[in-house]
Amino acid sequence: MALEMYDTVKSTEGRLLAVPKHGGSAEEIKSLTPVLSAYLYTSAGISVGNQTIKTALDTLEGLTMQRAEQTVALRSAVTTSVISKIYDRNGSSETFSVPTCVYIDLGSHDSEVVRVNEYGWSLLSDERKIASDSNQEYPAAPLFRRTATIRPLPVPVRSTNGRDHLASILGLTPTDPKFLLVWGWLVASVFVNIPRPALWLTGQQGSGKTTLGLLALSVVNPTERMGGNFGKNERDDLTLLSGS
């Protein structure tokens, strides 16, 4: 029954996930008990004990463990192209990857995703509608999963002064070095395939650090609380950042 509703995936981190066949974000297989219980009751009028469903899901996890690993993103994903470029007269070259598209999961109930590239941004739902109307293949997108801390982002709207407006909301000016640091951090935060800088906010108590931080975070990943404080040494800081 579960396989009629979901495809199963093993992520590169070893997570065993179920992906709705009609589209949507990946979920932990072990979290499907309430969904399957409700489905059985509404479709067949029967009530099955949790232990029975747990046994079935354990079996499904065992089968999924045998699958090849697949990349599953959290909030954002980056697709890249491999390029070889000639660097010297001897013809030696270096192969490197450059980002082609950034995908951002809005965390909404309809699984909306924003695709960003050098030409701008678009909603995947709009792209798929255009593809459907013209009988073309749907644009592919990375597979996303969500955690309990993932909160929805608003659907973006086009604006000619979005950067200036954000600076005003943060209580800064567009040319303020502080705003430029925040802006750079926001842009870097979605490039999950490379090391990214941390944003440390310092200042006296009551200077607005928490408010500024929460407002900045709300652009890419809304949350009710800030991250941790400085550690005792660099190793503590790196440990904290690696889990954020």
Report the location of each language-model feature.
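P-loop NTPase catalytic core of nucleic-acid-dependent motor ATPases
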Residues: S125-L238
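Conserved P-loop NTPase "ATPase switch" module shared by AAA+ and STAND
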Residues: S242-S244
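N-terminal nucleic-acid engagement/recognition segments and initiation subdomains in replication
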Residues: M1-V157
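Charged/polar, solvent-exposed surface patches and flexible loops
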Residues: A38-T42, T55-G62, D164-S168, A188, ...
